[in-house]
Swiss-Prot record:
Superkingdom of the source species: Bacteria
One Pfam short name: NAD_Gly3P_dh_C
Name of the gene this protein is made from: gpsA
Record-listed E.C. numbers: 1.1.1.94
Pathway: Membrane lipid metabolism; glycerophospholipid metabolism
EC supergroup of this enzyme: oxidoreductase
Protein name: Glycerol-3-phosphate dehydrogenase [NAD(P)+]
Binding site for NADPH: W11, R30, R31, K95, A127, R241, V265, E267
């Protein structure tokens, strides 16, 4: 079956590689991917799979299934330009909250496609490990269980994909864990110790669940792969962009410098502000996200973490 992956960043290429084991994959990106795809295609060909082919948007739209791996902040614009069929089968693999309209991913998508045609990819994984074929378990959330299973059955042998409902819980967990991961990086960067880190992450999980429950997210989603699993991975690894943002802030570097050195998108930065604004609107208690927002605006890192440990 033909699958189109939209987005040529590290995550998009990793997903193209993963789906390429069992399927014919087309990838659509503004950048030239000839060199980045070479090693991935060599690996696919060695397994008897077809190589990933970079094509233009119109060719990509002829695929049967669509996987979207672009920044959440550009997702609405992408949907507007792509003009997908209303019943297009879409798996969104982007984690975050749109800052401009304070909208969740599913809220953006429903303006352009049938909600029953939408899936959301969640769970603990890094692009760098997927392209090595290392094992992981992910969750495909959808209100349409049959569609979630269809996507799950297209994943490679090294990925265990579960099909679950609760799309709102899955996308909130995927967005919120990036926020807590920044705080986790700060905690480690300041060498506050394992006890403080454990307290931060456990309270962060509670905060994530509280926020998600307000919008109908289920407890089991936040305690499973989509929530706890992704949080513990992202908040503890140097492979995580958001964790590295926290490490940089712990060195008293201005946020602008940290992001410039990172050279990649860290969704948690903008997601933090979106969460705080949403929480303020609905009266949801989010002490970690609120304190982190102050840190991102320039509050002293030591003062911020001291306040955070006491409040969280």
């Amino acid at each position: 079956m033909e699958i189109a992956v939209f987005g040529g960043g590290a995550w998009g290429r990793a997903l193209a590689f993963a789906f390429g084991e069992k399927n014919e994959v087309k990838i659509i990106s503004r950048r030239d991917l000839n060199e980045p795809l070479k090693k991935l295609n060599d690996a696919l060909i060695s397994k008897g799979s077809a190589p990933i082919e970079q094509v233009d948007l119109q060719r990509g739209l002829k695929a049967v299934l669509y996987v979207i791996a672009i920044s959440v902040q550009h997702l609405r614009e992408w949907f507007q330009n792509a003009s997908l069929p209303k019943n297009a089968k879409v798996l969104i693999a982007s984690k975050g909250i749109e800052v401009l309209n304070r909208a969740f991913v599913s809220e953006i998508a429903k303006d352009f496609i049938d909600p029953n045609s939408l899936c959301f990819l969640a769970g603990p994984s890094f692009a760098a490990e997927i392209i090595q074929g290392l094992p992981c378990a992910l969750v495909i959330h959808s209100n349409n269980q049959a569609l979630a299973l269809e996507f799950a059955n297209k994943t490679p042998s090294f990925i265990r994909a579960y099909a679950q409902q609760d799309i709102i819980g899955g996308e909130i967990a995927g967005a919120y864990k990036n926020v807590i991961a920044i705080a986790g990086g700060v905690c480690d960067g300041l060498k506050l110790g394992n006890s403080a880190k454990a307290s931060l992450l456990s309270r962060g999980l509670v905060e994530m669940q509280r926020f998600g429950a307000f919008f109908g997210g289920k407890t089991e989603t936040f305690l499973g792969l989509s929530g706890a699993g992704d949080l513990f991975l992202t908040a503890n690894s140097i492979l995580s962009r958001n964790y590295r943002v926290g490490l940089g802030l712990a060195q008293n570097k201005p946020l602008e410098v940290v992001l410039e050195e990172l050279g990649e998108v860290a969704e948690g930065v903008k997601t933090t502000n979106a969460i705080v604004e949403i929480a303020r609107k609905y009266g949801i208690y989010t002490p970690i996200a609120s304190e982190l927002a102050l840190l991102l605006k320039g509050k002293s890192v030591l003062e911020s973490m001291n306040d955070l440990i006491r409040r969280a």
